[in-house]
Amino acid sequence: NLFQFEKLIKKSGMLWYSAYGCYCGWGGQGRPKDATDRCCFVHDCCYGKVTGCNPKCGGTNPCKKQICECDRAAAICFRDNLKTYDSKTYWKYPK
């Protein structure tokens, strides 16, 4: 869930990433604007590849593990690309 994801990325997902670039937050189109936006694009694609699952599912089923892996990969991507985060240019960027 979102709270677990925020704990994983050590930032507030709602504050830092909810309206960043073309892919962070709801929806997305076009080319990612920078490496941070690309992390969101890859995260969206990862969720899209998790078949037959709802990101809110719980328990120890494969769905939860696949979603967790998507979130873990995104957290690593955000960490590795934190220097590209440019809120002055890409915050609330038109989607």
From Swiss-Prot:
UniProt note on tissues of expression: Expressed by the venom gland.
Pfam family, one: Phospholip_A2_1
Annotated catalytic residues: 43, 71
The EC number(s) this enzyme carries: 3.1.1.4
GO biological process: arachidonate secretion; lipid catabolic process; negative regulation of T cell proliferation; phospholipid metabolic process
This protein's UniProt keywords: Calcium, Disulfide bond, Hydrolase, Lipid degradation, Lipid metabolism, Lipoprotein, Metal-binding, Palmitate, Secreted, Toxin
Lipid positions (N6-palmitoyl lysine): 7, 10
Disulfide bonds: 24-40, 39-77, 46-70, 53-63, 57-68
Reactions catalysed according to its record: a 1,2-diacyl-sn-glycero-3-phosphocholine + H2O = a 1-acyl-sn-glycero-3-phosphocholine + a fatty acid + H(+)
Keyword Lipoprotein set for record: yes
A GO MF label: calcium ion binding
Note on how the cofactor is bound: Binds 1 Ca(2+) ion per subunit.
Compartment annotation: Secreted
Enzyme class: hydrolase
Co-factor(s): Ca(2+)
Function: PLA2 catalyzes the calcium-dependent hydrolysis of the 2-acyl groups in 3-sn-phosphoglycerides. Induces local and systemic myotoxicity in an intramuscular mouse model. Induces local edema in a mouse footpad assay. Does not exhibit any anticoagulant effects. Does not mediate an antibacterial effect against Gram-negative and Gram-positive bacteria.
Family: Belongs to the phospholipase A2 family. Group II subfamily. D49 sub-subfamily.
Record text on subunit structure and interactions: Monomer.
Protein name according to UniProt: Basic phospholipase A2
Organism: Agkistrodon piscivorus leucostoma (Western cottonmouth)
Classification of source organism: Eukaryota, Metazoa, Chordata, Craniata, Vertebrata
